Amino acid sequence: VAHESSLLLSGFTLISGPCVLEDAGLNLEVAREVQRLAGDRGLDVIFKASFDKANRSRPGAARGPGLEKGLRLLAEVGAATGLPLLTDVHEPGQCARA
């Protein structure tokens, strides 16, 4: 069964990470675990996390570290793991920075 499941996953890229960026230590812990799990299965992986969760439905809910700090946190994950990075943007003006 393990052999069959690895054949089914062949050629897939896993995009994974926390919903929103947390503190640097937790981001790195998640990235390394995702990298390990993907590597064990022969998958490529892209680390994805948001710097701003603008779609929160509860007023005052935590939204993330913001653009500048979030990009720094993502860069730290990339530098430490070598993983490609992905985030989402909510406004056209954020694209140049991201």
What is each PLM-predicted segment?
Residues V1-E4, N27-L43:
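Short amphipathic alpha-helices and their capping/turn segments at secondary-structure boundaries
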Residues V1-I15:
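N-terminal amphipathic alpha-helix/helix-capping segment at the start of soluble metabolic enzymes
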Residues L9-T13, R41-V45, A79-L85:
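Short, well-ordered coil/turn segments that N-cap beta-strands
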Residues T13, C19, G60:
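Short glycine- and Lys/Arg-enriched binding-loop motifs that mark or flank ligand-binding interfaces
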Residues T13-S16, K48-S50:
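Short beta-strands and strand-loop turn motifs
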Residues C19, Q35-G39, L83:
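Long, contiguous binding/interaction regions
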Residues L21-E33, P65-R72:
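Glycine-rich anion/phosphate-binding loops
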Residues A49-A98:
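N-terminal active-site wall of soluble small-molecule enzyme domains
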